[in-house]
Amino acid sequence: MSEETPTNVWKEINTAWDGQDGYIATNPAGGSVLMGKDKQGNPGVGPMELLLVGLAGCTGMDVVSILEKKRQKPEKMEVRVLGNQKTDTYPKVFTEFHVEYLMWGNDLKEKDVEQAIQLSEEKYCSVGGTLAKAGPIHSTYRIIRE
């Protein structure tokens, strides 16, 4: 393992098998997520889906934060991520991604939304920066005015 430096830090997650079909991943702060199934058979999120969750959460947090700085806070926002996954060979990696941003807000300015998305994609979202090495990330957005 390489050393931590002032410009590099290790992140940690611990994943424990529940003895059946589930795995609980926990971070040092105590946050957790279920992969597989819980002991009652209820489905959790799959490991590959967690990559998509990470991308949606990372870019979503960036976009809202940037818009808030521009005094353009959406009333509501959803981020939908699709990953195109190989199925014919192992490992079954993602080769392309599509991110769709849905934002609700009568006062949102298209220019500010576009700039927030661009800044997230090109500068701030570490998950996107990592996944972009696996394949291109395309994005679209819609502003819903009610």
Predicted regions and their residues:
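Alpha-helical metal-binding/catalytic segments enriched in His/Glu/Asp
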Residues: 55-59
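Extended beta-strand/beta-hairpin segments
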Residues: 1-53, 64-146
